[in-house]
Amino acid sequence: MRVVFMGTPEFAVPSLSEILANGHDVVRVYTQPPRKSGRGQKLTKSPVHQFADIMGIPVETPEKFRRSSAIDGLEAIDADVACVVAYGQILTSRALATPKYGCLNLHGSLLPRWRGAAPVQRAIMAGDTQTGVQIMQMAKGLDTGDILLSETVDIKDTDTAETLASRLSHVGAEMWARTLGAVEREALRPTPQTGEATYAHKIEKSEARIDWTRPAKELDCHIRGLSPFPGAWCEIGGARVKIHLAKPADGKGDAGTVINASGIIACANGCLLYTSPSPRDRQKSRMPSSA
């Protein structure tokens, strides 16, 4: 089939790779424009853009896909289907209807739970024990389309947003072969979403500051859900310390008190041992203080 692929972050690369490996003709890739990043603030292509360049696939980077010129270009491609994975742009009704079989989206949750921008992070932060990956037929609403294929994935007690996203991206990539095969055979059986919807709102930087008055288990989930970006943090001895991993530990004290130099901090009920500060942060945290 003639496939258009739309995606931007590393999460989307395995899907593009798998679609190519299954012999589909990816005629165009759409991704976000290059952005400034790193200490030198150099313009950097997205991971999907870089992979498409390696594979020799033409790439389009419209600032806003809702503009008529971008949709005109999509119509001219005459694609059978568009595969969308974390593209980061809103597709209009006209765009959704352009490919012969419409636009299919891979989403990192079991819908309708965690519709929106940050389903992986929110699932961990909420203490969910399961999530999943689904491919849906895109509709006008936010992640409201009918489900075409679904896989459940367990969330481990040690999962961070990074490790869970990596696992979901590879599970999702393997789902494209079955989905596109069903598209070719015109054998899709869409299933409407059921149940109460919850929304995975974009992660705000203000959420990264640790509130030690919360229970230890909640904070464990919160910290892992924000790892590695933006990274949870607190102040220890007047210094800002990022905490990427933590686990419940024994100890007593007022919330926010550093119990000892090994990194045990008191919470509302119980304590947390933070286990992965950077060497620089570890040096800062050795003096017992209030977090």
Please place each PLM-identified region on the residue numbering.
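N-terminal Rossmann-like dinucleotide-binding module
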Residues: 1-39
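Internal alpha/beta domain cores that form substrate/cofactor-binding pockets in large enzymes
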Residues: 2, 28, 58-77, 90-106
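Donor/substrate-binding cores of folate-linked one-carbon enzymes
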Residues: 22, 32, 81-199
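N-terminal beta-loop-helix "entrance" segment that forms/cooperates
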Residues: 36-49, 53
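Core alpha/beta nucleotide-donor-binding catalytic domains of modification enzymes
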Residues: 41-46, 62-69, 84
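Acyl-group handling in specialized metabolite and lipid biosynthesis
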Residues: 201-214
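An anion-binding loop in the catalytic cleft
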Residues: 213-276, 280-282
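Positively charged, low-complexity/disordered segments
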Residues: 279-281, 285-291
